[in-house]
């Protein structure tokens, strides 16, 4: 039985899921916006938001903890020097999930994941939003 099991399986084993969300989080921190399926976007929120919250307190322990999850020095440095100070006064809700139509191949519901209030362009949303 699957009672009290949180999170989505997404038809992947646990190591694949962990690697996928690590790569998606790295891409989000690098580009400030990514396009993915809606269910992956909702699950990505559970990975990204605690990382930004932890990065608000700059300590060696927090840097090592986040590095153990992201495994990229440049992304960790950007997270602590640019993103965390930007969200210092925000208590949570660092990412925005916008529905972006359906994928052409399998009609999967797509979403745009953006960092809130950060200098991102919303042109991607205008181009890809088509619910017809």
UniProtKB/Swiss-Prot annotation:
One of its GO terms (molecular function) is structural constituent of ribosome. One of its GO terms (biological process) is translation. The keyword Ribonucleoprotein applies. Transmembrane segments: none annotated. The keyword Ribosomal protein applies. Keywords: Ribonucleoprotein, Ribosomal protein. InterPro entries: Ribosomal_bL17, Ribosomal_bL17_CS, Ribosomal_bL17_sf. SUPFAM superfamilies: Prokaryotic ribosomal protein L17. Part of the 50S ribosomal subunit. Contacts protein L32. Belongs to the bacterial ribosomal protein bL17 family. This is Large ribosomal subunit protein bL17. The lineage of its organism: Bacteria, Pseudomonadati, Pseudomonadota, Gammaproteobacteria, Candidatus Pseudothioglobaceae.
